[in-house]
Amino acid sequence: MISYRKLAMRVLGHSPVSAARTARRSTAKRAAALALTAALVVGMTLPAFAQDWYIEDGDISISAGETGNKVTQGSTTKENDTDTVIKSKDSSTASSNTVTINADEGKTVNVTLDNVTINVDEGYEHGYDPNAYKTAVSVTGSGNTNIELNGNNTLTSGYGHAGLEHNKTDGSGTLTIQDEKNDDGSAKGSASDTTGSLTATGGYHSAGIGGSDKQDGQVTITGGEITATGGNGAAGIGGGAGDKYAAVGGDGDVTISGGTITATGGSLAAGIGGGAYGNGTVTVTDGDITAKATGMYGAGIGGGFGAIPKDTLIGGNGTVTISGGTITEASGGYMAAGIGSGYQGLGTVTIEGDAVIKNAQGGEAGAGIGSGTYGDSEIIIRGDAVIENAESSANGAGIGSGQGDLYPDGDGMVIDLTVGNVTIEGNAKIENAKSGSGGSGIGGGAVGIGNVIIRGNAQIGNATGGDEGAGIGGGVLGTGDVTIEGNVTIENAQGGAGAAGIGGGAETQPDTEDTRNKVSIKSTEAGSPNITAKGGGVLNGGGVLDENAPLAGAAAIGSGSVADGATEVKSDITVEGKVTIDATSGGNVAIGDSTNGETRFSGLQVGTTITRRNAKGDDVSQPGDVVREPEKPAQPTVTPTERAEAPSNGSVEVERPVTVEGLYVANVLGKQITHTCTQNGTTLTIRANGIVASAHLTLGMVRTLKAQGVKTLVFTTLLSRSTTVSVDALLAAEPDAPDETAVVWTHTGPRAALTIGGADHSALLK
């Protein structure tokens, strides 16, 4: 150790010499030197150095100082510690000492755990009062705490305390767990990078990382290898067990932007999110995550067990946003979703960006992605997100809602339907969505309604309903309201026995005359849908309402079947634009319902192909299902068929019949009907003998007409319905489109529409 004298001499610029060669100084000189040394020592601020703190040496308390941390261990206190590192002398032997971190408002504490092992679990030695037990590492205060991981760290807490505890209150700050540096302190970015790890285990009713008993928890993870296990009733990462009567605690607020995470919740709790009677708010932007609930009622990622002790739901809700990273597995407990809500909660799930969900597995009666039993769901899947597998073991939707409620009441049954609202858009891809039984692949769980929108460039591989559940739409006893728009591909929408491929579940009966299954399929500027749907086959007994009553096979698109003598819900099905549909019935009707039979479509665009087959393989296609391209003339021309005498002074235009090669007019069934064309000066008029009719041209025809001097087109149908369009305006609408681009001009009673290449340009009509 350098003496004060030597330090003073160095400061003065002198090199000390040994006492053997120093002449004896007078007392006065020695006094002067001592006075100078004392003055220097008192006036200097010694630099703060990093220090390692060993947990075996006692409990450690850390708080934020002015330029670093204030660290206290036993009788030792150090101010302004700029690099606080906590270690174990022997990480193979757990210490029973603890770490307490407190960050005041507006300040940040940075701490490194370096191969620390703490175990303060004493079982139930002190009874059932959490205050009698210890916490391995506790984070408090209104400021922020960052914990860096080096090596392998293990934290195990006692009864009522989280392994790494951070209780969320109105005034609390944030806890961030990170692995920003290598174990030697160097920056990441090489092949020799090391990964710090943390294994945290909570005591009874306490999270592995997050909230303690009857407390909410807040956790942010940016990196590292994290393994967290919650105690009974608590999340692996998130909330401790709440109190359903006091309505306190249990909520989990978790953000993950990196790392490899394995989280296991205790019974009634989520793997990541809410504890028992708690809600889960989880945001994932990156990382590789495996999250599992054990026992009952908690989601893999999302809400814990929701209860209604006093007519008000306490907990259960799951709000999950995943915009990146990989969910390797998210498994919910019995009656809970894989990703979404726990028992009775609302599942609000957004999956977007480049997120990948490899496997989302709902427990029995819970959805793979969506809600638990008796809960509704609001789901958006968009961007470039990929869902490889979303599945319910039974009665929940693969993607959608959990099971609804059905119970006897007097001579009847009370049906309390859940609702699965699902939107799939952008470039999202669903490879497999499946229900084990009763629920839909995408939409409603058993005893659930499915409201589904699929649009943009979305791709659906397999959407498979369980017995009596639609592939896309309603679960058993539930209607389906499905909208499919744009460049959507559905490779296989397979209904379970008695249920539609797309539409309603089996045994769905109307509450009112207005109760309908609704399916809308149409092309947009994004492109045309390509759909393959198959209705479920016969169910020989085992139905929900009457287990002895068999059910007939169902439509590929439309309604599920009902028992003999029951009233089947009708279907409203609309198809617009250009579509490709391959529909195979499980019974007799491919597209429609048993009451009205096959639904017919009219006015579809050129290129449309609808194929219909019944369960026997017979073709049951309808007129208008196939709309072929008209033969393109080599050179469309306008030729007078009867010339009128020219006026003597040339001042009067005469209307004359003409023929436009390649132009045809079709009726509502897609069949060609008689039409005439006349020209008066620069105006060409097309007349059709029908109230509902479509004139079919191509842009090549219109360009030729312009070259021949035609400036205005008129389309006239019965009841004196006429609309006009400027040739220049029509060509300017799609100036770069090729000659073969279809132009379809439709009159439907008093309404008129104009499409060019499938795009709506009705605004051009006058």
Predicted features by range, described:
Residues 1-25:
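N-terminal secretory signal peptides that target proteins for export/translocation
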Residues 2-3, 9, 30, 34, ...:
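A composition-driven surface/loop motif
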Residues 12, 36-37, 758:
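Enrichment for repetitive, rod-forming helical segments
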Residues 21-28, 41-49:
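C-terminal segment of classical bacterial N-terminal signal peptides
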Residues 85-87, 108-114, 119-121, 128-133, ...:
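Long, contiguous ectodomains of secretory-pathway proteins
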